A protein has these predicted regions:
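Catalytic alpha-helical scaffold of carbohydrate-active enzymes acting on polysaccharides/glycoconjugates
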Residues: 2-118
Length: 118
């Protein structure tokens, strides 16, 4: 039976290829940091409501004004979180991929500059 669904959800299926990593390594790891701080919904950005979906606050209701708790969660990442992770990866000379929200990077040029220079 031919599946007409356009996405490949099967992959290799039961025919997993034999992978040979350089230097006989047995595992490959990719580190990715999502940088979103400043790109979330916020009335300061002209949004109708503050962020309600992308947070650790489960069941948040839309607020027409500023949601200080939500803003605080996001600000932790730009004020402290990024710098701690960045320092650690720099210290151990580990590569780090950034999945950055354009608006967030535009609002924090110091972090953007540091990412580009690393």
């Amino acid at each position: 039976m031919k599946n007409k669904y356009p996405r490949n959800l099967l992959g290799y299926g039961s025919n997993t290829p034999e992978v040979k990593w350089p230097n006989k390594a047995r595992i490959a790891v990719q580190f990715v940091l999502n940088y979103e701080e400043g790109g979330e919904n916020c009335v300061l950005h002209g949004d109708k409501f503050s962020e309600i979906f992308l947070s650790e606050i489960i069941g948040t209701k839309p607020i027409k004004g500023r949601h200080i708790n939500m803003e605080s969660l996001y600000e932790y990442g730009s004020r402290v979180g990024f710098w701690r992770v960045h320092k650690l990866f720099k210290e151990y000379k580990l590569p780090l991929t950034i999945f950055g929200v354009g608006m967030a990077l535009k609002r924090n040029l110091e972090i953007c500059k540091e990412m580009k220079e690393s």
